Swiss-Prot record:
UniProt cross-references to Pfam families, sorted A to Z: Ribosomal_L17 (PF01196)
Example of a GO cellular component annotation carried by this entry: cytosolic large ribosomal subunit
Subunit structure: Part of the 50S ribosomal subunit. Contacts protein L32.
Domain of life from the UniProt record: Bacteria
Entry protein name: Large ribosomal subunit protein bL17
Membrane-spanning residues: none
Alphabetical GO biological process terms: translation
Disulfide bonds, paired cysteine numbers: none
Similarity remark: Belongs to the bacterial ribosomal protein bL17 family.
GO molecular-function term, one example from the UniProt record: structural constituent of ribosome
Taxonomic source organism: Nostoc punctiforme (strain ATCC 29133 / PCC 73102)
InterPro entries from the UniProt entry: Ribosomal_bL17 (IPR000456), Ribosomal_bL17_CS (IPR047859), Ribosomal_bL17_sf (IPR036373)
Keywords linked to the UniProt accession: Ribonucleoprotein, Ribosomal protein
Length: 116
């Protein structure tokens, strides 16, 4: 039974799931918009919002936490410079998920996740 199970497992072990979410988060912050499956987009939303909230905080501890999660150091630097001006007045809801056509090979539900 699935009672009180809070983590979407994405059919992967914990270390692979963590690596997948780190890479998807890095690419979404780098490009601003990516196409992925709907479930991955929904799980990715919470991770990206955490990183943007850290960047809004702007402290040294928040920067170090972001550096431990996002792969690219220059990307973290750019994130911490741009986010306070871009999302300064917004209290959450930094991403948007748009449903698209299913994937051709296996008919998986696809979505575009983008930064607002």
């Amino acid at each position: 039974m699935r009672h009180r199970c809070r983590v979407k497992k994405l059919s992967k072990p914990a270390d692979q799931r963590r690596a997948l979410l780190r890479s998807l988060t890095t690419e979404l912050i780098r490009h601003g918009k990516i196409t992925t499956t709907l479930i991955r987009a929904k799980v990715l939303r919470s991770e990206v919002e955490k990183m943007i909230t850290l960047a809004k905080n702007g402290s040294l501890a928040a920067r170090r936490e972001a550096l431990g999660y996002i792969f690219d150091k220059q990307l973290v630097h750019a994130l911490f410079e741009q986010v306070p001006t871009r999302y300064g007045d917004r209290q959450g809801g930094y991403t948007r998920i748009l449903h698209t056509v299913p994937r051709r090979g296996d008919n998986a539900k696809m979505a575009i996740i983008e930064l607002v």
